Amino acid sequence: MPTIQQLVRSERRKINKKTKSPALKSCPQRRGVCTRVYTTTPKKPNSALRKVARVRLTSGFEVTAYIPGVGHNIQEHSVVLIRGGRIKDLPGVRYHVVRGTLDAAGVKDRRKSRSKYGTKKPKS
């Protein structure tokens, strides 16, 4: 505990919280251009081919973003919207592509949790 005299001399320092998504620069989403679209494998207990894209953002950062859902139409030079949110079993992947905006189409034939995958209400 500091004494009152020590507090008079210099005030308490604020603890600075480190952001988990620095490339967004305090914005909810950021636009970017895909420089590479590829698949990668997850960490140890899991096994799959996860779809990811390397994206150059308008903030100047180049980040790796996960493409959620079954099937996608994203290719090199596609313009996509990126939001925060990491993928626990992919090291270094801290962002998600927002489906159903810009060049990223929504997931086809999706019935449940449609808003998360940019899918319109099915006729019927």
UniProtKB/Swiss-Prot annotation:
GO terms for molecular function: rRNA binding; structural constituent of ribosome. Its main location: plastid. The keyword RNA-binding applies. One of its GO terms (biological process) is translation. GO terms for cellular component: chloroplast; small ribosomal subunit. It comes from the Eukaryota. It is found in: Plastid, Chloroplast. The keyword Plastid applies. Keywords: Chloroplast, Plastid, Ribonucleoprotein, Ribosomal protein, RNA-binding, rRNA-binding. InterPro entries: NA-bd_OB-fold (IPR012340), Ribosomal_uS12 (IPR006032), Ribosomal_uS12_bac (IPR005679). Residues 11-20, 109-124 have a biased composition (Basic residues). Belongs to the universal ribosomal protein uS12 family. NCBIfam families: rpsL_bact. HAMAP family: Ribosomal_uS12_B. This is Small ribosomal subunit protein uS12c. The gene is rps12.
